[in-house]
């Protein structure tokens, strides 16, 4: 079973983007956190290391992780076999569109209908039901698109609605996988800003392999 958050951690203040929030005993501060205003979708090529370490961690209970981070690789292949690749990341926080929808709204419009596209997403958690529905509709009408989604955690996987949505993704031809430790290392090397004084090598957290196996089993049970 995946590592649960320790009791001490549960007693600590909620965090935003991996940074601790102080003075939560202040009623006004609590109100600010509960009534967060909409944020814009953020795009870029590399995300801060502390975001990655907090948001992508494959824990069972994702307390405080109220964003979706989506790192993407787009490979476009012409009829002649030439391949062009691009990559970047998207993040959301209480935005109108989730990161998955933002990809379709801001990245996909640049696609050339004459090319074939293989898109890989590395997402901090699996899609919600609404985003899964959007993915299914997009795949059904975009015949030159193949999509592989690798997720760090399963979002609300015990909910029947979520389970049904994940099965629909599979039926639509979307390949859905749980991230292995090697996938987290790939993100670290290719999508994370290497801050001054930060170790260049990826340092796996405790139970990363155990948690991968836990989620892999859950996903297999859902998709069978």
Curated annotation (Swiss-Prot):
It is an enzyme of class 3 (hydrolase). The active site is at 100 (proton donor). Keywords: Hydrolase, Metal-binding, mRNA processing, Zinc. Zn(2+) binds at residues 60, 98, 128, 131. It catalyses: cytidine(6666) in apoB mRNA + H2O + H(+) = uridine(6666) in apoB mRNA + NH4(+). One of its GO terms (molecular function) is metal ion binding. One of its GO terms (cellular component) is cytoplasm. PROSITE patterns: CYT_DCMP_DEAMINASES_2 (PS51747). Its EC number is 3.5.4.36. Residues 64-169 form the CMP/dCMP-type deaminase domain. It holds the Pfam family APOBEC2. One of its GO terms (biological process) is positive regulation of gene expression via chromosomal CpG island demethylation. Binds 1 Zn(2+) ion per subunit. Residues 1-25 are annotated as: Disordered. InterPro entries: APOBEC_Cyt_Deaminase (IPR050610), CMP_dCMP_dom (IPR002125), Cytidine_deaminase-like (IPR016193). Its cofactor is Zn(2+). Homotetramer. Probable C to U editing enzyme whose physiological substrate is not yet known. Does not display detectable apoB mRNA editing. Has a low intrinsic cytidine deaminase activity. May play a role in the epigenetic regulation of gene expression through the process of active DNA demethylation. PANTHER family: C-U-EDITING ENZYME APOBEC-2, MRNA EDITING ENZYME. Belongs to the cytidine and deoxycytidylate deaminase family. This is Probable C->U-editing enzyme APOBEC-2. It comes from Bos taurus (Bovine). The gene is APOBEC2.
